[in-house]
């Protein structure tokens, strides 16, 4: 890869800023509607006692948790550390541009999603994980009562002693159950309050 081109791509991305998930309400509302309308019963395999995976809503949860990109996992580097290190960021960009490990793309086609993926998966890097909102909602559908005047039931309550990054909270909102949670991390809790209040 031509060093001059690589430097230009690097500088262009640095000028744009870190590729956080969008925070505008139109985008968030669209993603929320996709999450709510997802047919989560398709995830449940009762015979084998398995709840499948779907990424619906994870991006919404992450959009409230910008600080998560800088949280250490053991001795691994964080995505923010890669972003702030010119040498490593260039190596990651080069892997996208050359198609080494990542799908090959020309500079003008690299998206914020591509950048987030590269920053998460760069060698020696790890990002904190999140509970899938669809899996949480499917669990609540199975194990927690719902409000039903027909059946005379009230919505059940889930207590989450370590809320994490909003996946289970979003699942509770989608499933229509009460959710009580605690989390010791102040920036995380602020993000969770924003999810709750939106």
Segments (PLM) and residue ranges:
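Class I S-adenosyl-L-methionine-dependent methyltransferase catalytic core
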Residues: 1-51, 55-57, 73-198
């Amino acid at each position: 890869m031509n060093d001059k081109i690589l430097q230009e791509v690097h500088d262009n991305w640095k000028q744009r800023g870190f590729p956080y998930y969008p925070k505008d309400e139109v985008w968030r509302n669209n993603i929320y509607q996709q999450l709510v309308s997802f047919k989560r019963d398709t995830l449940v395999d009762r015979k084998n006692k398995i709840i499948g995976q779907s990424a619906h809503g994870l991006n919404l949860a992450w959009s409230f948790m910008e600080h998560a990109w800088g949280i250490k996992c053991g001795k691994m580097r964080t995505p923010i550390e890669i972003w702030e290190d010119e040498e490593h960021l260039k190596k990651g960009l080069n892997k996208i541009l050359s198609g080494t490990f990542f799908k090959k793309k020309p500079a003008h086609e690299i998206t914020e999603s591509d950048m987030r993926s590269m920053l998460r998966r760069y060698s020696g890097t790890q990002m904190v994980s999140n509970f899938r909102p669809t899996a949480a909602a499917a669990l609540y559908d199975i194990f927690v009562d719902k409000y039903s005047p027909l059946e005379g039931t009230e919505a059940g309550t889930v207590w989450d002693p370590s809320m994490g990054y909003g996946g289970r909270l979003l699942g509770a909102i989608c499933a229509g159950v009460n959710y009580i949670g605690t989390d010791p991390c102040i920036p995380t809790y602020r993000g969770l309050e924003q999810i709750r209040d939106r």
